Amino acid sequence: MAQNNAVAGFNALNGVELSLFTTDELKAIHYATMEVLMNPGVQVSDPEARQIFKENGCEVDEKTSIVKIPEYLVRRALQLAPSRFVLWGRDKKYNTVQEAGGKVHWTCFGTGVKMCKYQDGKYVTVDSVEQDIADIAKLCDWAENIDYFSLPVSARDWAGKGAQDVHETLTPIANTAKHYHHIDPVGEHVDYYRDIVKAYYGGDEEEARKKPIFSMLLCPTSPLELSVNACQVIIRGARFGMPVNVLSMAMSGGSSPVYLAGTLVTHNAEVLSGIVLAQLTVPGAKVWYGSSTTTFDLKKGTAPVGSPELGLISAAVAKLAQFYGLPSYVAGTOSDAKIPDNQAGHEKTMTCLLPALAGANTIYGAGMLELGMTFSMEQLVIDNDIIKMVKKAMQGIPVSPETLAVESIQKVGIGNNFLALKQTRMLVDYPSSPMLIDRRMFGDWAASGSKDLAAVANEKVQDILKNHQVPPVDADILKDMQAIVDKADRAFKEG
């Protein structure tokens, strides 16, 4: 239920909070998860990961690759995992704290494979390329309500031609001063990522560990599997001091039970198994509790991300992460619409607001369309407005002697207005004030060209791409970073 005057995830003491579960219900999900981790357990495809589990007391069947994780190891891992860590930006003013029970932050969606391009009021979809990543990074650098950058689309122009994921590492770092979260890393290439970050710090690995400008995301395979790639991202990320996001993408009714509570059980087992592996590898490794879990539309045969179920699951995951004392990273601001239209606005607001009120530490989805397949730069700048308005709603209605304003009411008296009051003029920024969403009357809107929101957003996108300046990486350092990408490309071509 919604409660007024509760501590919100956003920086407000009198905000609105979504409680969602009782403590007993959270415990019930936890204990059900502990049963599942022992029976049937989790299939772990990576031999190195199985050995780590085995050496630390797990029952491991090498024939089936099934690992059974006892509750005491889960509890130990939760004690070791930090409840707070900092995501560093190239510019420290963009440093972002991820903290269980702390502020809510937003990042863009990832990872799509297409771009929705706006051209003279019409839309076309094309494969995403490396330049799209650079352009979106620049937009996110500008967007005041996007706190850090997540890989939004794939550099498909490099698919089969070079080390695509390594290109997807350098390009964002060079095009935004905000922290970069790689959503599609390759386990065997984590060494390249480390070397790129080290090069940024002039070869100083200790500095790179202390001030991580780069982090990674991996997904268990639902139901109840950790792939070789997922394990290697966890293991190498932990060893190199990179924050790692263990994010399940279960689908209720498909790869998890049709009941959302049951889906939370398998989701929880998948994420906790990855977090346990991280802590067994390096105690104190920085980890998120992640979710892109949604429902499976049994009638349409799709996995919608603009659904109320996604918003509820993301809110539930935020509460589970708080229960465990872990920072959370969840899907939201999501839509199944194909273009920036009415459907997109409705679905994005709904899926943004629910996890925000639950106190999720990061909500990702800005810019995303078409069930997560497509990215729109126009939608990104619209979502920047939606997020701003959700932040305002999270603040609730603070009640204090100042905000009750009895003296102002008495001063103005009956039948007058408050516009001339000094207090009103001083608080001109107090009411919500979106940048693109239009609040004018019809006549004024028509006189300015009758432009719809997507057209206005397109103009804003073009202005940002032309005029926004991103602080550059030092030329010599960038050359060293590029040399690592070139090395990865040569290794790819040599096979």
From Swiss-Prot:
Q: In which pathway does it act?
A: One-carbon metabolism; methanogenesis from trimethylamine
Pfam families documented for this protein: MTTB
What reaction does this catalyse?
Answer: Co(I)-[trimethylamine-specific corrinoid protein] + trimethylamine + H(+) = methyl-Co(III)-[trimethylamine-specific corrinoid protein] + dimethylamine
Q: Which residues form the signal peptide?
A: none
The GO terms describing molecular function are: trimethylamine methyltransferase activity
* InterPro entries found in the cross-reference section: MttB-like_sf (IPR038601), MttB_Methanosar (IPR012740), MTTB_MeTrfase (IPR010426)
Which Enzyme Commission numbers does its entry carry?
A: 2.1.1.250
Single GO biological process annotation from the record: methanogenesis
- What is the main EC category here? transferase
Keywords of the record, alphabetical order, are:
Methanogenesis, Methyltransferase, Pyrrolysine, Transferase
Partners and quaternary state? Can form a complex with MttC.
Q: What the protein does?
A: Catalyzes the transfer of a methyl group from trimethylamine to the corrinoid cofactor of MttC.
The similarity comment for this entry is: Belongs to the trimethylamine methyltransferase family.
User: What is the protein name stated in its UniProt record?
Assistant: Trimethylamine methyltransferase MttB2
